[in-house]
Amino acid sequence: MKKVELVFIPSPGAGHLVPTLQFAKRLIDRNDRISITILAIQSYFPTTLSSYTKSIAASEPRIRFIDVPQPQDRPPQEMYKSPAKFFSLYIESQVPSVKKIITNLVSSSANSSDSIRVAALVVDLFCVSMIDVAKELNIPSYLFLTSNAGYLAFMLHLPIVNEKNQIAVEESDPEWSIPGIVHPVPPRVFPVALTDGRCSAYIKLASRFRETRGIIVNTFVELETHAITLFSTDDGIPPVYPVGPVIDMDDGQAHSNLDQAQRDRIIKWLDDQPQKSVVFLCFGSMGSFRAEQVKEIALGLEQSGQRFLWSLRMPSPIGTVPCDCSNLEEVLPDGFLERTNGKKGLICGWAPQVEILAHSATGGFLSHCGWNSILESLWHGVPITTWPMYAEQQLNAFRMARELGMALEMRLDYKRGSADVVGADEIERAVVGVMEKDSEVRKKVEEMGKMARKAVKDGGSSFASVGRFIEDVIGENSGFK
């Protein structure tokens, strides 16, 4: 039997790259005919992911990385004020280099005695411009969406609305009825790019989805039954493969800036806490707060009386990753550290999120509602309180709280950089609510965690979906069997 090569083009950010590599590992584990080539687009901004990709390359001989050369003409950093437009232009600037690399791969496979064929190009949300390369080289293209089925429904709906009436979204506009999402969606929870006056780039991305051979989504049928059922009955939508949860169970590798001593300090402190007694606060790789908001969070935690583990990070210049706080006493209320740190709570910088959510002492999660974080919390049965920041997190928070009933609603429409300060009393209520021992939300989350684990096992819905994707790529229809 002939072997096949799948070429993945992920976005360089951790939230996109890590699940892409985990899915690649899942594919090679399932079928020994598959090898994976990752075209590594370098991040415009400094990251800590190089050691993670090196560890994958060293441990997985059928996954290799090819670095895409940096283009000479890159979009200016000021454009990062509109991330969707910035990333789209940055990725588009890579197209000539990517085309050259893939052309060489196709040529090499055609001349190789090993009978390895380039079977498909798998692109990220921000890399849909690479679909043109696949078309030119007559290679099927697939989209790997690191977000969820509800977000996919939203993106598929955007071009339809735009064709009827040029979109100019205001937060005060009427709610939208979106096929695949149960409740009408208020524009205030739309992805930030659509409500900041710069939505054309977002619509351009969404308009390419239907050009692919199929769409792989990091979700599972049991979690998003409504949306996935709709996709399966709409002939105008490419086949959808719900393959999740695709999560990294060893997230320490992905963030080498977390030193072992800090990890050990965190886990040792958790080991000393009662079961399900700690609320974990973490807001993603780009989540941070100004000093006045930090003080309110601290006061809310103290008022709640709950034990807490707080990953506290401070804003950095635009386009760079938030940094750990160098002087906690400057941003926290007077005496807060003396009263709480190491006793009722622990404040840290970057934290091993998966390991913390898996710990028996963790009972709740105050989260930015990034999709990877949501999947990790469901996997470990830890309920979330919503505090979205950016990207599609507001939509995620809305659906988790209002549609799925698996999160407690604190804020749904908060946006990073907002002048709005969430007060201590509101934070106190949210923390106390998420830590309630016998809440309906906790019961639902724990039950969905069990379903998530079944979904990825042999006989599960996502296991079957991965098999269907493999068959569609290398089976009879693609001519590589």
Swiss-Prot record:
Protein name as annotated: UDP-glycosyltransferase 71K2
Listed transmembrane segments: none
Similarity comment: family membership: Belongs to the UDP-glycosyltransferase family.
Source taxon at top rank: Eukaryota
Gene Ontology MF terms in the entry: UDP-glucosyltransferase activity
InterPro entries per UniProt: UDP-glycosyltransf_plant, UDP_glucos_trans, UDP_glycos_trans_CS
The keyword Glycosyltransferase is assigned to this record: yes
One Pfam family linked to the record: UDPGT
Described purpose of this protein according to its UniProt entry: Glycosyltransferase that possesses chalcone and flavonol 2'-O-glycosyltransferase activity. Converts phloretin to phlorizin (phloretin 2'-O-glucoside), a potent antioxidant. Possesses glycosyltransferase activity toward quercetin, isoliquiritigenin, butein and caffeic acid.
EC number in record: 2.4.1.-
UniProt xrefs under SUPFAM superfamilies: UDP-Glycosyltransferase/glycogen phosphorylase (SSF53756)
Temperature characteristics of this protein: Optimum temperature is 25 degrees Celsius.
Keyword field: Glycosyltransferase, Transferase
Residues reported to bind UDP-alpha-D-glucose: 285, 350-351, 368-376, 390-393
pH dependence: Optimum pH is 6.25.
Protein species of origin: Pyrus communis
